[in-house]
Amino acid sequence: MMSEHDLADVVQIAVEDLSPDHPVVLENHVVTDEDEPALKRQRLEINCQDPSIKTICLRLDSIEAKLQALEATCKSLEEKLDLVTNKQHSPIQVPMVAGSPLGATQTCNKVRCVVPQTTVILNNDRQNAIVAKMEDPLSNRAPDSLENVISNAVPGRRQNTIVVKVPGQEDSHHEDGESGSEASDSVSSCGQAGSQSIGSNVTLITLNSEEDYPNGTWLGDENNPEMRVRCAIIPSDMLHISTNCRTAEKMALTLLDYLFHREVQAVSNLSGQGKHGKKQLDPLTIYGIRCHLFYKFGITESDWYRIKQSIDSKCRTAWRRKQRGQSLAVKSFSRRTPNSSSYCPSEPMMSTPPPASELPQPQPQPQALHYALANAQQVQIHQIGEDGQVQVGHLHIAQVPQGEQVQITQDSEGNLQIHHVGQDGQLLEATRIPCLLAPSVFKASSGQVLQGAQLIAVASSDPAAAGVDGSPLQGSDIQVQYVQLAPVSDHTAGAQTAEALQPTLQPEMQLEHGAIQIQ
């Protein structure tokens, strides 16, 4: 038998024969000096790391893109912050609004300002004043300075006085070109004679008393003399407002219509600023609305800031409607009686109604005017009601010779009565026309509003101009003429009045866009 050593040699030889290129060395193989060195094998590189490197590169690219987007966002925020800090409003062009009389308009970017905080400081000196300081974060005015202003400016005042800090022109953020009251407080300056302006940003407002409007009501808490303003709204209307207005904003806009005529709203705003030269709504009345909302609904300063924006928006809407020749009337007021009107239409440019002692006394009734018809067999009467609609009434008078008189009277109920007066001064016939809407409001181009029976419109035709000769007038032949009523005591005085007014019976007005304007 073969020994163990011999068997190992045989196995080694057999393995070398099987793999001549890669000889396998067994563990028990002993290398001697005579043996040849083993062949070195070539090392193969493994490329399995390529997908991992590509994934890392893609992630790095994604991070870089996000960093670039973050940098762009930071730059945008820096630009906006600089824009707000430096108050640099970049104007933008907006397309023309349909029906706009001025064509394309220009506006500014809306910038919301910080809502000012209201601090009420009571002053127990003899003037019993209130210091209502509107603190702006950009202002460093101290409360003591405002109290000193009161002490130096209004010594010995009997009524309460409000001192208001008004944001200056540079502090206002204009919402658009029509209003400059985006950031200003509503009670910024006073339109009453008892108010005084101190500096550019402080105005004194003297609170009124019950004697100013004995038939009116209080805005605000009537038991708190520091948070109430007397207004001309009668108690029944105030009850109606309190019942129907469920939100603070609706009540504010409703009170605005009761306290300010739409004509006043169209030419005014809260700040009295803007490129259109608008006037300022009476700050005392606006302060009364503010007190009323705080008392009824417990609103906050933030709510009042939003309501002020709605008031300014309502004024801008009235201004646009006026520019387009549209009606400015309040539809809910169309059935109100003259006594329930809180404003005086005969004085539309006043922010608030005058006290009861200054109201004009009603003219005696009836009022009459003798008007000479020129071959007219039909009289057309135009009236504009409080809803702004032109109401037309027709009167047919048969066989009225040229040169004879027609007497127009108005009774205490507002009804018009047309009388045909013969040459002997006797009333031949009478026709009664119910008053279409009372009071009738006639608007002139100057902005003056005439109320009730102060002005009526009758229609006739000049035979030479219309080409008619005693035949019934056609609608196109009627020329609208306006004649002011004059009180007469008898028919003789009426005839003299007609002779005096005869040269003035020329067409002076025209009907345009549903409103009557003086040429």
From Swiss-Prot:
Annotated crosslink Glycyl lysine isopeptide (Lys-Gly) (interchain with G-Cter in SUMO2) location: 133
Annotated segments matching region DNA-binding: 342-393
Annotated region described as Interaction with CUX1 and HDAC1, given as residue ranges: 152-342
Coiled-coil intervals: 53-90
Keyword DNA damage listed: no
Modified residues annotated as N6-acetyllysine in this record: 275
Sequence ranges assigned to domain BEN in this UniProt record: 226-322
One Pfam family from the record: BEN
Domain of life, source organism: Eukaryota
Biased amino acid composition, Basic and acidic residues: 168-177
Post-translational modification: MAPK1/MAPK3-mediated phosphorylation at Thr-337 and Thr-352 results in export to the cytoplasm.
PROSITE patterns: BEN (PS51457)
Protein location: Nucleus; Nucleus speckle; Cytoplasm
Positions of modified residues (Phosphothreonine): 337, 352
Protein name, UniProt field: Protein BANP
Biased composition (Low complexity): 180-189
Region Disordered, annotated ranges: 168-196, 327-364
Phosphoserine sites (modified residues): 19, 90, 100
Cellular compartments per GO CC: cytoplasm; nuclear body; nuclear speck; nucleoplasm
GO biological process, one term: chromatin organization
Keywords associated with the record: Acetylation, Cell cycle, Chromatin regulator, Coiled coil, Cytoplasm, Developmental protein, DNA-binding, Isopeptide bond, Nucleus, Phosphoprotein, Repressor, RNA-binding, Transcription, Transcription regulation, Tumor suppressor, Ubl conjugation
Biased composition (Pro residues): 351-364
InterPro entries documented for this protein: BANP, BEN_domain
Lineage: Eukaryota, Metazoa, Chordata, Craniata, Vertebrata
Biased composition (Polar residues): 335-344
GO molecular function, one term: DNA binding
